[in-house]
Amino acid sequence: MRKTINILFFVVSFLLLNSCSKDEKELLAVESNRIDNLHAPQTSDYSTNPPSVSGDFVKFNFSSGGITTDSSDWDIAFRGTTIAVNGGSETGTNGEPARNGNAAAYIIEDVFGNVNSVTESAFVQDGSSGFAIPTGSGNGWYNYDFRTNQVSPITGKVLVFRTADGFYAKVEILSYYKDLDPSNLENARYYTFNYVYQPNEGETSFE
């Protein structure tokens, strides 16, 4: 009798454990990637005061890990040194894309590898007051040297994003020049950056 009870207990325990394991959602691995030479051209007209800038923003999707031409399926977009997010509203910038997602961003000063989680309260969206990633030398992700006309990413500036569909990513911009070569100004407006993308809904950790 005791043997029968033990067998029944084992069977019931196995079924319960198996049922629980099926209910638990298996998490996807956090994705770490590097993008090289993403071209973000712009046209500047210096005949006006102040000079005007035009050109399409180059849209990027973290889920696919690449450039997209889709007007709605994008997370961030680049033009020159400006980075837009697909969330909030228009800033009034010429040629900016329409926002139709819930993307947002903030900048944190830290070592890229040490930024392991998201601070929800820090997120900002684009709007009439400006871009979530501030523009201008020293305000956001870069410094501009007026003597050399070079743009340099600020060491320790990590860009944290909420994507258009509510997932999370962090970005470390390595260079603004093609093949990481700032010696020729013709190489400007080519982004190279590391990013980590959290592909699991509701997960805010980058580990």
Locations of the language-model features?
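Basic side chains
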Residues: 2-3, 22
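Surface-exposed, beta-sheet-biased, low-hydrophobicity segments with strongly acidic/polar composition
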Residues: 21-207
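Sec-dependent signal peptide recognition
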Residues: 3-10
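C-terminal motif of bacterial Sec signal peptides marking the signal peptidase cleavage site
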Residues: 16-19
